[in-house]
Swiss-Prot record:
A molecular function (GO) term: phosphoglycerate kinase activity
Enzyme class: transferase
Catalysed transformations (reactions): (2R)-3-phosphoglycerate + ATP = (2R)-3-phospho-glyceroyl phosphate + ADP
Binding residues for ATP: 199, 321, 347-350
Family that this chain belongs to: Belongs to the phosphoglycerate kinase family.
Species of provenance: Dechloromonas aromatica (strain RCB)
Cellular location(s): Cytoplasm
Pathway where this protein functions: Carbohydrate degradation; glycolysis; pyruvate from D-glyceraldehyde 3-phosphate: step 2/5
This protein's name: Phosphoglycerate kinase
Binding positions (substrate): 21-23, 37, 60-63, 115, 148
UniProt key word Ligase: no
Amino acid sequence: MNVIKLTDLDVSGKRVFIRADLNVPQDEAGNITEDTRIRASLPSIKYCLEKGAAVMVTSHLGRPTEGELNHEDSLMPVAVRLGQMLHTSVRLITDWVDGGFEVKPGEVVLLENCRVNKGEKKNNDELAQKMAKLCDIYVNDAFGTAHRAEATTHGIAKYAPVACAGMLMGAEIDALSKALHEPKRPLVAIVGGSKVSSKLTILKSLASKVDQLIVGGGIANTFLLADGKRIGHSLAEPDLVKEAHTIMDIMKERGAEVPLPTDVVVADEVSALARANKISVDDVHANDRILDVGPKTAAKFAEIIANAGTIVWNGPVGVFELPQFAGGTKMMASAIAHSEAFSIAGGGDTLAAIAKFHIADDVGYISTGGGAFLEFLEGKTLPAIAILEERAA
């Protein structure tokens, strides 16, 4: 993969536009609850500041309506947190597309939520050209959005005088290549979470590559349905049962497996006060909701992880935010932390689980990408990386 790297360039005195991924979770009061993505963007920003560049950073946050900036869509909390990390004040610039603001060499500003700009998501050419005029060097450091061709991830890279990969983007690509192109076997993928339909096609692709495919959350429930099990009121997608069957068949033909839960933790509601019951997967009642894997299943998953050569982790296996449904994810996280295998983990919920169980130092590489992380594993062309390759040619 041939791209220009930020560290290959002389950025001193240059106007540098960095597209970062600062899409961090916030609570209802607007407080940032987990800041891994901001921390991950620091190396490129610091590198440019230390070299005396005039630095502009932008990101998306949430899913705003284009053309409307609402309070909850503002990057203001991110500007404050970024300033604390850099020990400097970071100005937040609104209505920035047409310029009209000044950035001094050695200064960094944050450009307000790029998804508020009309034409961002549709990769509008006119918008991309305007943004390209703001800089001498465009840096894509947002691996998390590399699978989307948008104006700040793709369009601007066509028109900026120079387009390169930031330090995070470069590290992401190197780590993912190591996990995918030459993985040490057995290769184990853990795919969990509630976004069933968005991950099933990716599961299909992983089915032809991995030795074991551990599924969790809403995804596992769909597989349990496919296996003829009753899942009560659990989150699942019955219309995708056929797809789940196909995945299990692909794995079986290769001598690989999808180890399904044999015991589960159920409750009649998802709440902090819910009473958790550990039962066999054959004893799920009509009103039960499966909210975690049971201890026997967790131990089985831990054993698979202990014997792995490479581990790819995206998504928890239960509602780990609530302590009574966190056991499965906790045991799995611990197994990954203690494993000798090269492990790569990614996705918002996964990052939160890693933080909760304090295993960040024991994971081989933590990816900041969710969908991009999985699509790269699938071998899809990521538009944001493809355009950087094109510009380097």
